[in-house]
Amino acid sequence: MFATKINAIMQHYETLAENDAYDWIRWKDGRTRFSKKVANRFFIGVMLDQGQKAERAWNAAEYLVDNYFNTSEDFWGDIATTHLARIKKICQTGYEGKSFALNYSFNKFPRNLKSSAKLMIEKYGSDPRNIWNVRAENVYQIYDRFLLFPGIGDALAKMAQFALVKNHGVAGGISSKSEMSIKPDILVRRVLRRVGLVSSGQTNVVVAQAREFGLSSPADFDAAVWVIGREYCFKSVPACNKCPIALACDSASV
């Protein structure tokens, strides 16, 4: 029964991968050569991609890096030497009068940003590229390193790893696809619980039980599940009648 459900999800991945609107779901050829500024945008995007739409988070990250903490060539050094009260004002009002972080991250982001600057300077030479500059056999280190930064939990660390390896060819790119595991964000957990692949939506349960799926490419499976969660499997009133895996779902009302 699990095989039927997993196959339905992977079939949806194949459908998505053929659609240019979902080009981010495909594995990219070659490796992206990040400038330091683009690397800073990526890291801030990871920090902000919680409690708000992904599109807003990544646009906000670009705006923050391009418009603040740029009095020197060292973005993280400028953050580290800026008083927390000033950082808080920028973070909560500096995005065209609005906050960069929303909801539960609104008050946490300023302090997390300053603490992250300290860690970035001490361990990675003020350069996020050093976080993911690893060989293919050490792809797991990307996840482990992101997880050490305040405000970046399991799901965000895994998302960062997926994006870097899949979309930017870091750590061997597609050759490392079997060495990763799914990211247990709220959308993925909801879909897996409802479809009947896990017994609970709790993060530790999802992570443990997903290891038993025998996935050849956890990142592809994860991407398809995430899209299903975002576009069909809503928290309230899910669109089961439109869901591409409804026939394989234990909870679908079609």
Name each model-derived stretch.
Residues 1-254:
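HhH-family (HhH-GPD) DNA N-glycosylase catalytic core used in base-excision repair
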